[in-house]
């Protein structure tokens, strides 16, 4: 799997921006992701461990142990010799290092495709520059109320965040804090499935494209309205300060790794984070509300003659408004791909 060896150097080159990439890729849950460009390396026992680039030996072990994870659908158009096959893959944007190497079924599907379609084209420098610019604190923006600012500062200190994070908008600061919650559970945006797929696709000579624009993503992440900013920061801290915040993320991540679509579909029922009509409206807007445009973008690429491997956050696959259902409504044959069972764990 020579292409994976080529993907790791690319992973190293963009690592400083990976958390910011994750911000754009997973706006639904404030505790999912955060920008590493502003993270202070852990130096004390109470700080979470920092992600590291896999060594040659670790990479070899990852390649040896790689197995299929996540949620894959085959998207078929037409019959006989004129038929075309594309793929829809539900990803997770915060993952364990052991998960970053695609398994054989996923790798073969990507290899057989013409292009990789992500929510954003995370390897386009213009996209990154626009994203970074939009996440920075805006001159003249109203400050947070003192009590809320103190609460945010206290949590930053607790999670060992460096001063550089203050360059971000307050909402992005809250999302930044979330990466440390993930690290405490052995998860990190640096190992996010989307960025790994982008590296592999580039090594394979595949085109990488975005299904959404930076403007679309940022519109869902930040606001210039002081009242909305305060609400986002307060609500985000409410989630981060929960004792079970890290465990909830770990449960969702493990559900993804095991391909348990039922758990992912019922996430709003067990996360204890969707309690009000406003919460439900926000979730609808952030997930189902974005799906029709992404489905149209996928269909446009397929109709242009490409076999597409579309990789989008797993929550976008759920329910009657999920991407599999929307593509089926467009006349495609959509079939969930079953992965081989993992080998049994042998006690040493």
Model-derived features with residue positions:
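N-terminal secretory signal peptides that target proteins for export/translocation
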Residues: 1-16
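Bacterial N-terminal signal peptides
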Residues: 17-33
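Short hydrophobic "helix-edge" motifs at membrane interfaces and signal-peptide entry regions
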Residues: 20, 80-82, 303-304
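Short, well-ordered alpha-helical scaffold segments within catalytic/effector domains
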Residues: 21, 103, 291-295
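Sec/Tat signal peptide C-region and signal peptidase I cleavage site
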Residues: 35-39
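Structured, acidic catalytic/metal-binding patches in enzyme active sites
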Residues: 40-67, 71-285
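C-terminal soluble interaction/assembly domains
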Residues: 284-348
């Amino acid at each position: 799997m020579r292409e994976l060896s080529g993907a790791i150097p690319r992973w190293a080159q963009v690592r400083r921006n990976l958390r910011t990439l994750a911000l754009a890729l997973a706006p639904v849950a404030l505790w999912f992701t955060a920008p590493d460009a502003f993270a202070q390396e852990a130096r004390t026992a109470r700080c979470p461990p920092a992600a590291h680039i896999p060594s040659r030996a670790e990479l070899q072990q990852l390649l040896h142990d790689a197995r299929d994870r996540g949620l894959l659908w085959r998207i078929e158009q037409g019959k006989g010799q004129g038929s075309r096959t594309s793929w829809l893959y539900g990803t997770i944007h915060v993952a364990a290092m052991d998960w970053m190497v695609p398994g054989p079924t996923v790798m073969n599907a990507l290899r057989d495709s013409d292009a990789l379609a992500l929510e954003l084209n995370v390897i386009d420098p213009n996209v990154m520059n626009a994203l970074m610019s939009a996440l920075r604190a805006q001159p003249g923006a109203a400050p947070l109320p003192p009590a809320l600012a103190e609460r945010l500062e206290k949590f930053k200190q607790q999670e060992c965040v460096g001063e550089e994070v203050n360059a971000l908008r307050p909402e992005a600061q809250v999302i930044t804090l979330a990466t440390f919650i993930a690290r405490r559970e052995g998860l990190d945006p640096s190992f996010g499935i989307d960025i790994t797929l982008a590296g592999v696709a580039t090594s394979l000579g595949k085109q990488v494209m975005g299904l959404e624009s930076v403007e679309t993503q940022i519109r869902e992440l930040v606001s210039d309205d002081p009242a909305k900013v305060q609400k986002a920061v307060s609500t985000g801290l409410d989630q981060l300060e929960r004792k079970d915040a890290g465990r909830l993320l770990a449960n969702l991540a493990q559900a993804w790794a095991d391909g348990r679509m039922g758990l992912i579909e019922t996430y709003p029922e067990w996360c204890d984070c969707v309690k009000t009509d406003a919460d439900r409206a926000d979730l609808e807007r952030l997930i189902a509300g974005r799906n029709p445009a992404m489905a149209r973008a996928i269909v446009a690429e397929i109709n242009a003659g490409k076999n597409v491997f579309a990789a989008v956050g797993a929550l976008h696959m759920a329910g009657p408004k999920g991407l599999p259902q929307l593509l089926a409504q467009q006349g495609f044959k959509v079939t969930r791909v079953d992965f081989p069972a993992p080998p049994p764990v042998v006690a040493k």
